[in-house]
């Protein structure tokens, strides 16, 4: 019962290491940015005005930068499929990391939601502090236009504020539609709202550019008879103001003076002239740059302007000197770092979508459509230049059924050098598959087995996207593999079996344990022919133990059943009842001492969890089980 | 698109908005903002929305995942009958609850989210959806011996069930009185 540390490390170790690296990156970024805004001299005055809210908002923003850029990478599926197949990633351990790409995407998503909450709360407090702690000394630093300005105005009339509110609403829609319950019941809602991510990224780019004057110049209509002239002036100014702030300054000098405050881009600014104006210095004109929590009129008095460092001799030496300011502090907005963070992954993702679009533009030619028992339809087709490895899946798109929906199906037969046909098995569960089946097989002939080619002139146009990788491709790279399938989950293994039927020698696999659990005896007929032919082939080649088949019928009503008269090899391998996994694992461990066995499961979650637990357990034969899993929905 | 059940999504949104309202309300009352009583109101409204929305309604097709421990609240929500069944009422209730919280900065986002949820509920109501409680399935007690209808009438070895059920279709000449066919005639006289 003990967890074998070797097995655990092999199964979970690399995954947890990557999680740890990601977590420490986030913590490091948060901490560094927090300290920068808390203690950095260039943010001294800003920090005095805003307090803790500034540090929290900027620190969470840097974590958001990292996660918004990382979250796109696991979704570049073509790139991941390429990495899986190429020799550039030689180690099986790193290839297994790619199985967890969806989980990583979800982790980044949840982090974005949490830190957005922190960021929004901190900025709301900042908005409040901007209005309460308005300082006339540093007009450039204020986001508010006058003291006690309503913070809600700051929120809705500045570009960062408005884009921020819109982004929160988009994130809210995306997040509520991505819960497990919605994905399982109404996948459409999840899919359509998740495509709003593009709007989110566009708003994010605008949010950090922070061009404040874009909105405040729209408010510039003063009197009715000059309104038209000024409005047109403002709008042309708005368009050019991004490039020529100086020009705008000239126009607006005789207009409202508060407008000059918002000349510079960005709401949060840093001080540029630290050498000539160290923070906390004394201005000989009487303006006092320290202790801003004192009311403004008190700070005018010169005798209070000595730094507080005199009373504490053990403070830093810079406080014991009275610093004289050479000049007024100058502030400048930061360059929007977020553009650097997200431009790379966003361009990569867009390039990949474009490539997928171009690649899937040509429709496939459907060769045959077969109807199998238990609501399964097999489609065989050909397409030019289509290459796939066993275990990969494709996405089908049929405009006659639905213009917007795409559905993934695992390939059950891959194209080889000699044969360009490939096929999928579809189980008819929802409305898309039902409508698709009605288009492929006219209702009158749905009982018959195979539709002759002559009647197939009116097949609908079908487009495929892919192939995309999945963990099952690895089953050919282990010396011994255990493949467990539940119901229609047998499809990835069917392509593996088809490949072995073609030629088994080039692969590393030398023994395959194939366990297939079904509820209905007729389901076994989907691949009964394939299994029998494979069995006979290995028998002829004198390798009868290459494929070990066990079929389980999990639900029975007491009547003795067989698959079919001609499938004797399968009938003798049919068991009634659920498999006993522990005994199976013990038997495999005993027969393959000291080897590494790859465990693959495509079926219900309960089986998957049991197998995962058993793979981490100790056994006395020195056999290691490595667990590989595909996560659906 | 035709078979989407909007109510489920609206339910998730309303639950999330309730939580956002509670958080915003806590920040407002703890920070002693001006108009902090609106913060207290928003906490109360958030709690009410969360309690109302916690039990998930049953889907019209397929099985629904229950939230953890929702059966107690399902009983309470079921008591209100048509008030909670009808989604029009829920839509307007949420809209009404959301409006006062919009006047305070800390709870403005909760208002926006709850307003969106109320809009989706309105859409669900227009499409005729209704809230129906998820009833717990009655536990089927396994009856001991329930499948044994009749004890076997012959000693072993017994032929399989199919052969046992076809005594009348056998060719004439088989002795009636049991499906057992004796390979040799048996009589009980001792000679």
From Swiss-Prot, chain B:
Keyword Ribonucleoprotein included in the entry's annotation: no
Extracellular topological intervals: 31-35, 105
Ranges in the topological domain labelled Cytoplasmic: 2-7, 54-69, 81-86, 127-191
Cross-link (Glycyl lysine isopeptide (Lys-Gly) (interchain with G-Cter in ubiquitin)): 149
Annotated membrane topology: Multi-pass membrane protein
Domain of life: Eukaryota
One Pfam family hit: Cytochrom_B558a
Key word Ubl conjugation present: yes
Transmembrane segments: 8-30, 36-53, 87-104, 106-126
GO MF, one example: metal ion binding
A single GO cellular-component term on record: NADPH oxidase complex
BP-aspect Gene Ontology terms: cytochrome complex assembly; establishment of localization in cell; inflammatory response; innate immune response; mucus secretion; positive regulation of defense response to bacterium; positive regulation of interleukin-6 production; positive regulation of mucus secretion
Subunit structure: Component of the phagocyte NADPH oxidase core complex/cytochrome b558 complex, composed of CYBB (heavy chain (beta)) and CYBA (light chain (alpha)). Component of the phagocyte NADPH oxidase complex composed of an obligatory core heterodimer formed by the membrane proteins CYBA and CYBB and the cytosolic regulatory subunits NCF1/p47-phox, NCF2/p67-phox, NCF4/p40-phox and the small GTPase RAC1 or RAC2. Interacts with NCF1 (via SH3 domain). Interacts with SH3PXD2A. Interacts with DUOX1, DUOX2 and TPO. Interacts with NOX4; this interaction mediates superoxide generation.
Entry similarity comment: Belongs to the p22phox family.
Function: Subunit of NADPH oxidase complexes that is required for the NADPH oxidase activity that generates, in various cell types, superoxide from molecular oxygen utilizing NADPH as an electron donor. Subunit of the phagocyte NADPH oxidase complex that mediates the transfer of electrons from cytosolic NADPH to O2 to produce the superoxide anion (O2(-)). In the activated complex, electrons are first transferred from NADPH to flavin adenine dinucleotide (FAD) and subsequently transferred via two heme molecules to molecular oxygen, producing superoxide through an outer-sphere reaction.
UniProt protein name: Cytochrome b-245 light chain
Organism: Bos taurus (Bovine)
């Amino acid at each position: 019962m003990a967890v074998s540390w070797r097995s655990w490390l092999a199964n979970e170790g690399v995954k947890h290491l990557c999680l740890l690296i990601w977590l420490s990156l986030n913590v490091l970024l948060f901490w560094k940015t927090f300290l920068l805004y808390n203690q950095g001299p260039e943010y001294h005055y800003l920090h005095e005005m805003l307090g803790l809210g500034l540090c929290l908002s900027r620190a969470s923003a840097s974590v958001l930068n990292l996660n918004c850029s990382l979250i796109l990478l696991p979704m570049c599926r073509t790139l991941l499929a390429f990495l899986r197949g190429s020799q550039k990633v030689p180690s099986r351990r790193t290839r297994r990391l790619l199985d967890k790409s969806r989980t990583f995407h979800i982790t980044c998503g949840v982090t974005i939601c949490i830190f957005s909450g922190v960021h929004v709360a901190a900025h709301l407090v900042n908005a409040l502090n901007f209005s309460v702690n308005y300082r006339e000394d540093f007009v450039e630093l204020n986001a508010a236009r006058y003291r006690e300005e309503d913070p809600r105005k700051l929120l809705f009339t500045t570009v960062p504020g408005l884009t921020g509110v819109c982004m929160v609403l988009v994130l809210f829609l995306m997040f509520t539609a991505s819960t497990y319950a919605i994905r399982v019941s109404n996948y459409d809602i999840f899919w359509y709202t998740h495509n709003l991510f593009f709007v989110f990224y566009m708003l994010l780019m605008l949010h950090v550019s922070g061009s404040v004057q874009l909105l405040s110049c729209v408010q510039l209509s003063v009197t009715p008879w000059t309104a038209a002239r000024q409005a047109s002036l403002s709008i042309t100014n708005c368009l050019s103001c991004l490039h020529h702030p100086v020009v705008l300054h000239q126009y607006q000098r005789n207009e409202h003076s508060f407008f000059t405050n918002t000349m510079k881009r960005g709401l949060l600014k840093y001080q540029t002239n630290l050498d000539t104006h160290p923070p906390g210095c004394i201005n000989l004109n009487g303006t006092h740059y320290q202790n801003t929590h004192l009311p403004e009129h008190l700070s005018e008095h010169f005798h209070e302007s000595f730094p507080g460092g005199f009373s504490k001799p053990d403070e830093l030496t810079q406080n014991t000197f009275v610093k004289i300011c050479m000049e007024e502090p100058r502030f400048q907005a930061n360059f929007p770092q977020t553009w650097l963070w997200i431009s790379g992954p966003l361009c990569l993702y867009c390039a990949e979508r474009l490539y997928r679009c171009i690649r899937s533009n040509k429709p496939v030619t459907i060769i045959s459509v077969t109807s199998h028992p238990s609501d399964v339809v097999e489609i065989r087709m050909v397409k030019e230049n289509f290459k796939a490895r066993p275990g990969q899946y494709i996405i089908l798109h049929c405009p006659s059924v639905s213009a917007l929906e795409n559905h993934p199906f695992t390939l059950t037969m891959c194209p080889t050098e000699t044969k360009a046909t490939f096929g999928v098995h579809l189980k008819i569960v929802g409305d898309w598959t039902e409508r698709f089946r009605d288009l492929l097989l006219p209702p009158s002939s749905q009982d018959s087995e195979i539709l002759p080619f002559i009647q197939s002139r009116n097949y609908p146009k079908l487009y495929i996207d892919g192939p995309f990788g999945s963990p099952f491709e690895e089953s050919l790279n282990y010396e011994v593999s255990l493949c467990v399938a539940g119901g229609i989950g047998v499809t990835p293994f069917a392509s593996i079996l088809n490949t072995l039927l073609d030629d088994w020698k080039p692969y590393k696999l030398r023994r395959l344990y194939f366990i297939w659990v079904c509820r209905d005896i007729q389901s076994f007929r989907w691949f009964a022919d394939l299994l029998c032919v494979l069995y006979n082939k290995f028998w002829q080649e004198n390798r009868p133990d290459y494929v070990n088949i066990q079929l389980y019928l999990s639900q029975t009503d007491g009547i003795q059943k067989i698959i079919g008269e001609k499938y004797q090899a399968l009938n003798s391998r049919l068991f009634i009842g659920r498999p006993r996994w522990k005994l199976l694992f013990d038997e495999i461990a005993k027969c393959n001492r000291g080897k590494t066995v790859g465990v693959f499961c495509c079926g219900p979650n309960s089986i998957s969890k049991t197998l995962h637990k058993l793979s981490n357990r100790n056994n006395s034969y020195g056999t290691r089980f490595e667990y590989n899993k595909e996560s659906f929905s | 698109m035709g078979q989407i059940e909007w109510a489920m999504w609206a339910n998730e949104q309303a639950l999330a908005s309730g939580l956002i309202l509670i958080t915003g309300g806590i920040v407002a009352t703890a920070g002693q903002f001006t108009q902090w009583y609106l913060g207290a109101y928003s906490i109360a409204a958030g709690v009410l929305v969360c309690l109302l929305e916690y039990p998930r309604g049953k889907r019209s097709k397929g099985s629904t995942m229950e939230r953890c421990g929702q059966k107690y609240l399902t009983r309470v929500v079921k008591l209100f009958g048509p008030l909670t069944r009808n989604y029009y009422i829920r839509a307007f209730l949420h809209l009404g609850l959301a409006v006062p919280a919009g006047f305070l900065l800390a709870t403005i986002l909760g208002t926006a989210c709850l307003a969106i949820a109320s809009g989706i509920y309105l859409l669900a109501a227009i499409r005729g959806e209704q809230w129906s409680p998820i009833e717990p399935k009655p536990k089927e007690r396994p009856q001991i011996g329930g499948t044994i209808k009749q004890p076997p009438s012959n000693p072993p070895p017994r032929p399989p069930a199919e052969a046992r059920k076809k005594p009348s279709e056998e060719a004439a000449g088989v002795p009636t009185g049991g499906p057992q066919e004796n390979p040799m005639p048996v009589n009980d006289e001792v000679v």
